[in-house]
């Protein structure tokens, strides 16, 4: 057998002397001795992190949650940088972009324009004839009525008289806010005139600047018409004998004056005379010209020309179609993807800024708590004994004080500290108070988990073997014990982020802390604004912040579960 051939004992051999076996009892084996050796691995070894990634990728729910979180993070980063509303004049908008004229504007998406869904329109019922007239006869460039959904004629019988009135259901455009009287600097006025002249719309139909409305002059004329109709004389000729008629005229004119003041967009003549020939103080009808258009009451100068502007004390007063003026002044259309709040701020932009602030706050506080908790728990769990006993009693004392009390104390003390407010600002004071309150006891949970894991693994054979070979405490803690506890720690750490976000949102929603007054916005402050606006009247203000915070809570939970399984060393090999 010098040639390394393999022989096996024949199975037919019976009882033989095994000390003296003859050669003929052996036969040649079919196994080649040269092939009896270890074979090289055909695949590369899987590292710890790669194995964790492979295990994480197998959890589809966690992968989807990760991408949703990534989208929200990108949304929070990109939108404040890309939105033109972020780059408006800081002198004109010291607290960021806002326009009260677009208060509670509805969500608008160009993709759905004209569909009745997410296009800035809404359907409302209960419009009276006068309401319909005000909206229908509008001299702005954008009529607020999209279409008439329905109109119902109702009757009310009072004795022998039957009063008929029409009730309209209309779809209106929340961005068609009509004409507004504003003041502009001379330089801005010159730019506006040049802008209109370049486009050939200066003082013509479709122009941004509209003629002033002079209701006072018309009402003075109408007062004389009433006196002439009732008494056959002018108003100034009325004597004390006709005092009751004069009182009636005064009451009607006062009512019409209030009506014009309440509806500044009315540019046409109104009549208080009813079909029965009496004068009403409550309902007014439009006076139409022969061509069917309302008779206007535009202001005219001494030459009979329409007045489009007035200069006084260094500024121009103009009446403009506000939507078109906004585009001219700011360079972009005043559309709000998620709608606007009571101050006319863009919810889409504020929600991105709020999500960014909430995420940074959550990640920052969680990171600090994780570092403190791991160090504290590692020392207590590794050394145990009296060290652990003392550290646990300190932890018990700290955890006995609620964080809300710490937050209240810090808010009061930091706010009253003039030097601190001057150094970090009002916003910094609130952030610092929140940071101290949640770092004060937020690390205790991580410390307890770390301590438990160290008690679990410090007595394992591989740790004892490393200690026998002379490994120092630092190497045992960070090289051998801590990596095996990473799975559990990662899960609790990741779930800490949505916990901080939810705590901040809850406190802001309840009004305990208010970042809005300091110029900051968070998801919680947006929820508080939505709750104050009312779900029934302005549901969009509450809907979108609720969706974002719900996605964050659910996705961080699923993401944390996926990381727990990925970093669990007992599952190593399950990815194959």
Report residues per predicted region.
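Membrane-topology segments of multi-pass transport proteins
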Residues: 1-58, 78-343, 576
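Aromatic-enriched hydrophobic runs in primary sequence
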Residues: 7-9, 14-41, 48, 73-75, ...
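Aromatic-acidic/polar surface patches that form glycan- and anion
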Residues: 45, 60, 548, 552
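Short, solvent-exposed loop/edge-beta patches enriched in aromatic
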Residues: 57-62, 356
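Alpha-helical transmembrane segments of integral membrane proteins
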Residues: 60-70, 340-576
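Short, strongly hydrophobic transmembrane alpha-helices
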Residues: 61-82, 374, 550
């Amino acid at each position: 057998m010098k040639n390394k051939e393999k022989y096996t004992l024949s199975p037919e051999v019976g009882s033989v002397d095994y000390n003296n076996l003859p050669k003929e009892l052996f036969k040649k084996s079919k196994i080649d001795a040269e092939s009896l050796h270890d074979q090289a691995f055909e695949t590369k070894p899987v590292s710890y992190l790669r194995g964790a990634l492979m295990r994480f990728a197998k959890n589809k729910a966690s992968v989807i949650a990760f991408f949703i979180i990534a989208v929200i993070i990108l949304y929070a980063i990109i939108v404040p940088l890309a939105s033109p509303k972020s780059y408006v004049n800081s002198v004109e908008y010291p607290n960021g972009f806002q326009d009260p004229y677009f208060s509670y504007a509805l969500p608008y998406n160009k993709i759905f324009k004209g569909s009745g869904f997410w296009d800035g329109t809404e359907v409302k019922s209960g419009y009276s004839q006068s309401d319909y007239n005000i909206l229908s006869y509008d001299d702005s460039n954008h009529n607020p009525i999209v279409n008439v959904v329905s109109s119902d004629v109702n009757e009310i019988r009072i004795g022998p008289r039957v009063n008929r009135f029409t009730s309209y259901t209309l779809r209106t455009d929340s961005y068609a806010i009509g004409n507004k009287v504003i003041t502009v600097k001379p330089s801005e006025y010159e730019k506006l005139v040049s802008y209109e002249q370049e486009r050939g719309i200066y003082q013509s139909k479709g122009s941004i600047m509209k003629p002033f409305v002079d209701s006072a002059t018309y009402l003075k004329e109408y007062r004389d018409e009433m006196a002439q109709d009732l008494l056959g004389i002018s108003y100034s000729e009325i004597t004390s004998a006709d005092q009751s008629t004069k009182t009636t005229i005064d009451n009607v004119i006062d009512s019409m004056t209030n009506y014009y003041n309440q509806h500044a967009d009315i540019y046409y003549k109104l009549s208080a005379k009813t079909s029965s020939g009496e004068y009403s103080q409550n309902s007014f009808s439009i006076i139409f010209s022969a061509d069917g258009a309302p008779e206007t009451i535009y202001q005219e100068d001494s030459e009979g020309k329409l007045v489009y502007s007035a200069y006084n004390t260094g500024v121009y007063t103009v009446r403009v179609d506000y939507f078109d003026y906004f585009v001219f002044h700011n360079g972009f259309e005043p559309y709000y993807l998620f709608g606007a709040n009571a101050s006319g701020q863009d919810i889409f932009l504020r929600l991105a800024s709020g999500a960014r602030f909430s995420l940074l706050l959550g990640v920052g506080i969680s990171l600090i708590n994780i570092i403190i908790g791991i160090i504290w728990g590692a020392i207590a769990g590794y050394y145990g004994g009296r060290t652990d006993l003392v550290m646990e009693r300190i932890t018990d004392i700290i955890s006995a004080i609620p964080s809300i009390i710490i937050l209240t104390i810090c808010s009061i003390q930091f706010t009253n500290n003039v030097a601190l407010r001057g150094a970090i600002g009002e916003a910094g004071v609130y952030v610092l108070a929140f940071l101290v309150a949640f770092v004060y006891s937020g690390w205790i949970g991580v410390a307890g988990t770390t301590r438990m894991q160290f008690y679990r693994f410090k007595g394992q054979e591989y740790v004892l073997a490393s200690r026998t070979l002379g490994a120092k405490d630092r190497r045992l803690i960070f090289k051998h014990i801590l990596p095996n506890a990473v799975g559990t720690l990662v899960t609790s750490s990741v779930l800490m982020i949505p916990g901080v976000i939810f705590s901040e949102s809850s406190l802001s929603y309840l009004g305990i802390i208010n970042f809005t007054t300091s110029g900051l916005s968070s998801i919680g402050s947006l929820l508080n604004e939505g709750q104050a606006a009312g779900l029934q009247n302005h549901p969009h203000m509450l809907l979108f912040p609720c969706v974002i915070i719900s996605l964050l809570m659910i996705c961080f939970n699923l993401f944390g579960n996926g990381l727990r399984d990925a970093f669990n060393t007992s599952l190593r090999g399950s990815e194959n």
